[in-house]
Structures are given as C-alpha cells and as structure tokens.
C-alpha cells in the first residue's frame, strides 16, 4: 500500500532540478520534523567534511536549501524568526555521498527491488546523495530518482548508472553483455539518452570494450565505474576510467599469470597472499593515482564474508521481510561453507592498500554495496565509517572519505560534501560524539536534505519488514 501511495503521488509532480527544494507530498511530509524558512542549529559539535579536526559549540544557519553561516555559537548571530534547535550533545556532519549503492536486494533466492525501503533506509542513516553502481531494473531506478527529486518519495538524490555492462559468458542475468567496441558505443549512447549519468562495467569485458565505453561515456559527459577483473586496475586507469570499485581485493594486477582480457579464477582470493608492500603493488598505486582514477572503499560488505568477524546487526535484521530474514540468517550460519571467504589477513591488506592509496595522493570515496549477507542500505554505509577508522584513518578523515571526497568524485563538490557557507544544507545530526566513540555514528536523529529536516526514526520505522518486499 505504501508503495502505491507514494508512487501515485509522485507521478503527478514535475521533475525538479537536483538540490532544489521540492514541494513535498503529504506522504513525504509526514517524515519531516524541520521545515522552516530559516533554521539555526546551535551548540553543535561539527565535523565539517574537510578532514580538519572537529570543532565544538558551533552554530549552523540554514536559509532555504543552503547554509548561510557557520561559526562559534558565541559569535554567530541567529536571525530573527529562525527556528532554533539546540543540538548540544550532538554532532553535525555533512550528508554522506555514497558511491556504490543499489536499490535492489540480491544474494538471496528472490532478488527484489528496494523501491521504497532502499530510499527510506539510505536517507534515515544520513546518505543524502548516492550513485547506483549497477541496476537490475534501470527504468525503475530512473523513475525512482524522478519521484525523489520531485518530492513524491523520501530518499537521497540518486545518480543513476544504468544496467550492468559486461562481456563474455553471462555472469548476471540482467547485465548487457558486449563483445565489440561499436556495440558498446551504441549501448552507452542509448543509456546516456535515457538519463544515466554513470556507466557501470562488471568483470568480464575486453579491454577494447571497456576503452570504447569510457570514450563514448566521456564524449557524452558521463563517467564510468567498474568492478573489474578481466581488465586490471592499471589498464583501466590508463584508459581514463573515473572510478574503480572495491580496491585491493578486486585488482587483478596482483594475480600471477594474468592473461589479457581474461578474468582469472583466483581473483578476490589470491590477494590474501599478496605482499601489499611489494614494489609491484606500490607501482600500481602510483599508476592509478597518476591517471587520476578514484577508488571506492567497500570494506563493510566484505567483512560480512568473514566467518571470524561477520555478525548480523539486530538493527538491520528488523528491516528484512520474514522469509528474507530466514534466508539471510541461514547464509550467515553457513558462511564458512560458502563461496567467497574473506580471511582476516585480506581485510587487513585491503585497509593497508587504502591507506597507501590516500597517502600517495589518491582520491578515496566509500559506498555500501547492499547484499544478502544482511548488509543493508544506510546502516552498511555507517559500518564503513567504523572500518575506515579501524584502518587507521582519523575520524575526520573517514568522514571526508564518505562525504567531500564522494562529492569530488561525482563532480558535485561545489554544492555538497562539506558544511560550508553557500553549500546545500545536506546534513546529518547524530546524538553523541562519533569522533571519540565511532559507534555513535549510528545514532542519527535528523537528516537535512536541501534544508529540510527528516526524522530518522520515522523513516526507519516505515522501512521495517520491507526489505525483500518493496
């Protein structure tokens, strides 16, 4: 019923420009807790997204959809008539920018779209912008984006990558397999005309296909990302790929005997025994950085394939439909006998590789990659924060990776990604201090998108039991 009401209302609304304030339908307005012409958040602890140390007792002024003042509470005047919200004891951060998001739930017997639950969960946990890194139902995602942007569906601003593009034997029933450069150019051109702004490649395409896809996408103003295998990271970087997914674990540069245009069977496993400090690995990092290809960290989803670390978060399990929950619980119980197993040493090497990539000047973002191991939108993004801190980044650096760096990768950093005057008021208000206590990051109270504050608990309540259904 909720799906029908929200989508029916959205169809009557015009598509509005990204980051403009939309007129909210009653179905969306019921999730809103703050919606005033001028809002003052006072006495906040502020992590601004730039990587600089957190500042205490700060005031943020929001006028319409934008931030108009940021500074110490003692010296930042609150405009007359503003709705003033004392957020002492809370931390304000930029809205997160996710770079590996999905609105379908896979890895279980019945793949389903998260047409309502996905946007609700993403927004409830502070993700205000997300790039869908591959779609099973691309037209559903395009329509979903239109509904969100028009104010008919609560959720983040989405950038759509269209369907998965691949090569060789089918690895995904809903991917488009490509064997020639000409065919690739035609398909990329088509999805550009349909509204995709990114293109996502999977792991079996040839170098010629990937090169053609990158060239055609760039000629049309689109960017390209990939979960690669048959083409190595350094090969793709040399072609000008914009964004490489998952980092060390998927980089087939490190597979001995790798054959051109072939995805080696041991990829994502042999990396566990690769010396991450070796000259070859260091050289590959330098090549990726020199070619200005960014990387997406997805540490959290791979942790769910680790028998010694994986856990089912009770908060996430509440959002699963009962039959889907049983499947996820069964998968978890039998994890050690499953397919992909990530040993602890591999996760540690993934973390080390990401630190070295950033130290070398690389641009690192982050994304969720929801999956049937119980790794869900929003809450999975926040697990990445904890793991980035565990990896050795400061809390402020981890926030930067998940916010401003993501905005830079998307080309939106002039508008979003940090808490600064003139930027869009995309913010998350968190109870506690996630700098001192990383687990506090889950205590999201209010999420501002385009200057409108959404009640996180109301959003989460509406998503309970929905993943696996809608």
What are the functions of these language-model segments?
Residues 44, 60, 65, 89, ...:
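Divalent metal-coordination and catalytic microenvironments
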Residues 118-139, 155-163, 193-205, 214, ...:
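Divalent metal-dependent hydrolysis catalytic cores, especially in the metallo-beta-lactamase
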Residues 90-152, 171, 176, 182, ...:
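Metal-associated gating/positioning segment near the N- to mid-region
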Residues 6-17:
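Bacterial N-terminal signal peptides
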Residues 23-27, 31-33, 37, 46, ...:
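Histidine-rich, glycine-flanked metal-binding segment
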Residues 187-205, 250-391, 466-470:
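Active-site neighborhoods of metal-dependent hydrolases
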Residues 18-22:
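Boundary at the C-terminal end of the N-terminal hydrophobic targeting segment
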Residues 28-33, 46-59, 72-73, 376-379, ...:
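Acidic, glycine-enriched loop/beta-strand segments at the rims
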